[in-house]
Amino acid sequence: RNELEKNGMQDIVIMSYAAKYASSFYGPFRDAIKAQKLSQIKDKKTYQMNTANSDEAMHEIALDLQEGADMVIIKPGMPYLDVIYRAKKEFQIPTFAYQVSGEYSMLLSVAGEKRNQELILESIFSFKRAGADGILSYFTPFLLKNL
């Protein structure tokens, strides 16, 4: 933040990736891009958060806010609705949910188009109920067409 402001970029908004969990829900994306072959790092758990720990996310968000972040993203979203809720309540900042490829694949795996549409909307509404100000989702084209 300080460097941006020193260079006359006061209007730049910083979105923190403070709460990125070492989740199995990233699997479909990693498989699609063959991430294991491209990366020397085989275990993302060395630098992503423990999936059982929500307090670490609050600590990391607080640090990023002290460093000038304006908003935060929680990734993946659905398994961490509690983290979205806590971040919004504790810090009162714009909070975003990222619905990752595994969440997308899981919802699409349910048979029947009508059922899928209901599940997609229910998942999006759950982010809003948890306090998300914005949602990044592979379902965005569907949502733009149907909402």
Task: List where the protein language model places each region.
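Alpha/beta enzyme core
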Residues: R1-L147
